[in-house]
Amino acid sequence: LFFPASEEDAKTLEFVNSWPSSLPELGFKMRTGIAVDFRETEWLRAEEGENAVPLLWPYNFNGYRIAFPIESKGKPQYLLNTLETQRLQMQKGNYLLLKRFTSKEERKRLQCCLLFEDDYLSFPSISTENHLNYIAKLSGKMGREELYGLFAVLNSSYMDNYFRILNGSTQVNANEINSLPFPSYSDIIKIGREAAALAQLSEAGCDAILEDLASCSSAGRAI
């Protein structure tokens, strides 16, 4: 049960609560990054070397994309690819990454970026550090329109404000994201097509796409 503290909060709740689905119902799920760095130190490497795969951290976020590798003291950029580390690896694919933690001073709680399969063609797999969350498809690989659609929803001010109303914490819990309302699958695809066509991704651009979709839906019901 949510209690809006302002008219803006009330509008946000009405807008997001009109969405009919959840991530699992759409065929996706958010999970927590696999590799806990202090438990896996023997497998982590600062340099690529032979037989290593990318290890992605929140520090690799660069706008809405991943910068890799980066120079970051104490944040090894590679994981050795061995039989023992198969449990820490993910197949290459399209993923939506979100930071698990933000500071109180930061404007956005939901900070996400796009990870494309073809970004890492030279590597057999990737890994994600435990301070990240990632959204993957439950069956098969996520398409680009699906990826852009989920990104636009989570990057919007509507979902960010909704999450703040729901939870005052600076931690983004995977279970909470999995229970949030999302547009229908067909709408996710429509949103994704428009987001992918944007000259430059932005929160305002994502908001505009969602608002246009809501306006079209309302007009359709009124006819």
Regions found by a protein language model. Name each.
Residues C206-I223:
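Short amphipathic coiled-coil heptad-repeat segments
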Residues P4-A199, A208-L213:
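Polybasic, glycine- and aromatic-enriched phosphate-binding surface used to engage nucleic acids
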